């Protein structure tokens, strides 16, 4: 996922009728009708990918409901085994950077330890302000405020590492790799977190679910990549025209 498309999805609700985006220096490049059209084309050609983007970057409830119903239909159509639907929905959580149930206790402890200070959220706000500045957005604009809200929500609800607050580094004077997330900025779930969350044995998972999980995850990323490409191509065409 390119940063430009991620930012576009975060900033603009495709259902909104009053969006206008700005380029660097505040010069208008794309208008609401163009953005809405690009999103509509992505939804038409890669419906799952579109709703995954909305689920990941906008936390759209309706999009997540669509993805969950897609998983149920997928499992029903191919007659997948016990735990399949639950496992694939957790795969969606992993793709959307949400913690799995087996991670919650550890993440909750880290949040309690590192996010209690009144200054704990400053890095998230700084990151949002930097993104707004790089994209020519006024600090007091609606879009900039949306970015700040989403960065704070990511810190509180996603698998963003509470210790480094998503930067991957700790230390005030001499920076070094965060030991909690191994420098990634995310406490990413593993297959073992997935197995523990659905309460199944490793032997059962490898025999009945592993190939399904791998195939579905690949399918999701292909759909997201396809939706992103449609949005990029459409907007590039609008700009060049």
Map each language-model feature to its residues:
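N-terminal alpha-helical interaction blocks
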Residues: 1-141
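Residue-level signal for well-ordered alpha-helical segments
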Residues: 138-141, 158, 197, 201
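Short linear interaction motifs
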Residues: 142-145, 162
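Short, flexible, mixed-charge glycine/proline-rich loop motifs
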Residues: 146-158, 166-172
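The −1 position to Zn-ligating cysteines in a subset of zinc-ribbon hairpins
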Residues: 160-163, 177-180
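Cys/His-coordinated zinc-binding microdomains
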Residues: 165-168, 182-185
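Short Cys/His-rich "knuckle" micro-motifs
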Residues: 171-176, 188-192
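Long, charge-rich boundary regions
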Residues: 186-241
């Amino acid at each position: 996922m390119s940063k430009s498309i991620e930012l576009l999805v975060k900033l603009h609700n495709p259902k909104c009728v009053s969006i206008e985006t700005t380029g660097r220096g505040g010069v208008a490049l794309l208008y609401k009708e163009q953005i809405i059209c690009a999103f509509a084309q992505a939804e038409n050609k890669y419906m799952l990918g579109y709703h995954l983007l909305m689920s990941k970057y906008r936390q759209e409830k309706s999009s997540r409901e669509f993805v969950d119903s897609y998983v149920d239909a997928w499992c029903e159509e191919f007659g997948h085994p016990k735990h399949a639907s639950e496992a694939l929905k957790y795969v969606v959580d992993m793709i959307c950077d949400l913690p799995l149930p087996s991670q919650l206790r550890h993440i909750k402890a880290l949040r309690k330890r590192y996010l209690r200070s009144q200054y704990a959220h400053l890095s998230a706000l700084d990151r949002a302000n930097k993104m707004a500045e790089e994209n020519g957005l006024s600090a007091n604009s609606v879009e900039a405020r949306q970015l700040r809200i989403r960065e704070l929500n990511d810190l509180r609800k996603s698998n963003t590492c509470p210790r480094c607050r998503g930067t991957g580094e700790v230390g005030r004077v001499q920076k070094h790799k965060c030991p909690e997330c191994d420098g990634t900025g995310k406490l990413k779930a593993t297959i073992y977190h997935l197995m523990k969350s659905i309460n199944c044995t490793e032997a059962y998972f490898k025999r009945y679910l592993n190939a399904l999980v791998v195939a579905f995850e690949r399918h999701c990323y292909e759909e997201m990549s396809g939706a992103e490409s449609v949005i990029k191509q459409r907007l590039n065409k609008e700009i060049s025209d």
